[in-house]
Amino acid sequence: MAPPAKRARRGLVPPGYKYLGPGNSLDQGEPTNPSDAAAKEHDEAYAAYLRSGKNPYLYFSPADQRFIDQTKDAKDWGGKIGHYFFRAKKAIAPVLTDTPDHPSTSRPTKPTKRSKPPPHIFINLAKKKKAGAGQVKRDNLAPMSDGAVQPDGGQPAVRNERATGSGNGSGGGGGGGSGGVGISTGTFNNQTEFKFLENGWVEITANSSRLVHLNMPESENYRRVVVNNMDKTAVNGNMALDDIHAQIVTPWSLVDANAWGVWFNPGDWQLIVNTMSELHLVSFEQEIFNVVLKTVSESATQPPTKVYNNDLTASLMVALDSNNTMPFTPAAMRSETLGFYPWKPTIPTPWRYYFQWDRTLIPSHTGTSGTPTNIYHGTDPDDVQFYTIENSVPVHLLRTGDEFATGTFFFDCKPCRLTHTWQTNRALGLPPFLNSLPQSEGATNFGDIGVQQDKRRGVTQMGNTNYITEATIMRPAEVGYSAPYYSFEASTQGPFKTPIAAGRGGAQTDENQAADGNPRYAFGRQHGQKTTTTGETPERFTYIAHQDTGRYPEGDWIQNINFNLPVTNDNVLLPTDPIGGKTGINYTNIFNTYGPLTALNNVPPVYPNGQIWDKEFDTDLKPRLHVNAPFVCQNNCPGQLFVKVAPNLTNEYDPDASANMSRIVTYSDFWWKGKLVFKAKLRASHTWNPIQQMSINVDNQFNYVPSNIGGMKIVYEKSQLAPRKLY
């Protein structure tokens, strides 16, 4: 008889928690809430202390401080009690200092003291301040500066470190100073870590770092800009060329890491799609550090010479919209996220958002008589919504050497499958019984059902006939749906192409065959285009999903009632039959079969250009799927991160003289890093046969390595090669 399974030690853990309390083991499963997750991290740190020969129970440690920071905004009673317990411990217990032989549970160890900066950096500064700047101490083991959970409305952490005579100059809130000049303030990490857990689960931690370059904005003003290309749509039949809209152009830039290529390299993605069956999005955190601000001046000589100087008093403005107050503007749909190459500097995209603008465009064709109805009406006063970051989101001011961390955001999303389905309606349920089986091998030897079609047993919905065939037998539901691909709907702000789930259609050049709806991506050098390509034309690819609706629209037909066998010409509507006497207009162009019986999978991850997560719509009736991203955040999503070089004015500034400020040309370089955590399920093999996996041939291998002058590209990879049954 097998010995009984050992139960995990519970310890003194209150109800509703797994790790919040002393004496429990570290294998209790997933934490129940953010406070419990902080407690688990705290327990792991304590275990590391004990292994190194230190007793954390008698001292106040950095792990205790991290727990205090992570639970400062806790809403649950256990988190509040734990928070105040360790605050009390902080007041009475001696301090325990982390050392390099004491590993953190969240990030690699680093020296706890920084070396002094080179003296020449502070020559000018020393004239104004006392000499002998002390070393700045820092807790390098704290995850993402403070590891604080970012709740709704939570405040990020800002650390301003000063190299002054006071020694340790760290503090919260905005501010400036010469701080960390010449001092390393972080790590550059682009590794993907795979931690294999129990029961076939894998924790995937994707680290990403980039050098970000930010110029000062062209203007410090918010501007309402209208795009008008009515000259294009004034020609009959050119409705799809419509670009008219209004947008608010802001002086801010958006740091957007919401694309697969920001986090995974091609080798990582190959490992994930070949070995795992589903992905769960767990948490996200990001940080800005090693801020550098410089001014640019130009000499009056010929030719002019540009001079670049560090400006220790200029500021970088940073704002985190943790409450999602501002319009949500994911940049992947415009291919404007952070770049995909870790060794290349990247830029944040200028932030702008749509403004309400009414537009009327009546459909026309080349044979239409008269001028098309082509009107833009302007903004309805009832719908005006003008957002500014300065009065909606807390803004932090960073100077050279300062840091900013968002804390940790925990996702609430449904998982994403990494397998595709092959079963369509014709492959659901029990196949018909065969009275005759083949007696020899060969493709020309078939089985035979044997029973006459009008004498078979089963269920149909035909009503007017007793014929039971593979075409007429009733299936449990409808797998996928047909949708008109080239369908444009009119809204009060103009026409738009209706999004559909990708299907398996026919040739896109045949008017009688529906296109498949697979997304087509256009992108530049930061996002996978061959870096030696010249000209302005972006590179493109069409992502042909394995997981589709299994449809074949050119084979559709509709039969008349009463149902007749065989069907005659006046009892059937074929894809090639015109509707309303219009040549080229048939029911596959306008027919939508989506309904309450429709079964459909989520959209696949598109590596590297696809969006990862999307925001849930603030509507009462919400869409079941989003076509841009496989993960849809419930209730809230990570706050957008905005940056801007603060105005660096000259003595000639006069607010009444001009709309343009008199500014010193200033730019910033800073380092950005983030951590995106997934949970994945290892794929088990349930079939005898091997399956197709993500691989490349010899010729394609050279797409992933640089040429002799550094030219390279990123080729998109499939994400759902492994098949699975759905019924």
UniProtKB/Swiss-Prot annotation:
Mg(2+) binds at residue 323. GO terms for biological process: adhesion receptor-mediated virion attachment to host cell; clathrin-dependent endocytosis of virus by host cell; entry receptor-mediated virion attachment to host cell; microtubule-dependent intracellular transport of viral material towards nucleus; symbiont entry into host cell via permeabilization of host membrane; viral penetration into host nucleus. Residues 19-64 are annotated as: Phospholipase A2-like. InterPro entries: Capsid/spike_ssDNA_virus, Parvovirus_coat, Phospholipase_A2-like, VP1/VP2. It holds the Pfam family Phospholip_A2_4. A motif (Nuclear localization signal) lies at residues 4-13. Residues 1-10 have a biased composition (Basic residues). Residues 25-35 have a biased composition (Polar residues). Disulfide bonds join 633-637. Keywords: Capsid protein, Clathrin-mediated endocytosis of virus by host, Cytoplasmic inwards viral transport, Disulfide bond, Host nucleus, Host-virus interaction, Magnesium, Metal-binding, Microtubular inwards viral transport, T=1 icosahedral capsid protein, Viral attachment to host adhesion receptor, Viral attachment to host cell, Viral attachment to host entry receptor, Viral penetration into host cytoplasm, Viral penetration into host nucleus, Viral penetration via permeabilization of host membrane, Virion, Virus endocytosis by host, Virus entry into host cell. GO terms for cellular component: host cell; host cell nucleus; T=1 icosahedral viral capsid. Residues 1-39, 95-120, 141-184 are annotated as: Disordered. The keyword Metal-binding applies. It is found in: Virion; Host nucleus. Its main location: virion. The N-terminus of VP1 is sequestered within the mature capsid. It contains a phospholipase A2-like region and nuclear localization signals that might be exposed by capsid modifications during virus entry. Interacts with host TFRC. Belongs to the parvoviridae capsid protein family. The capsids of autonomous parvoviruses expose a proportion of VP2 N-terminus and part of that sequence can be cleaved of to form VP3. Capsid protein self-assembles to form an icosahedral capsid with a T=1 symmetry, about 22 nm in diameter, and consisting of 60 copies of two size variants of the capsid proteins, VP1 and VP2, which differ by the presence of an N-terminal extension in the minor protein VP1. The capsid encapsulates the genomic ssDNA. Capsid proteins are responsible for the attachment to host cell receptor TFRC. This attachment induces virion internalization predominantly through clathrin-endocytosis. This is Capsid protein VP1. It comes from Canine parvovirustype 2 (isolate Dog/United States/CPV-d/1988) (CPV-2).
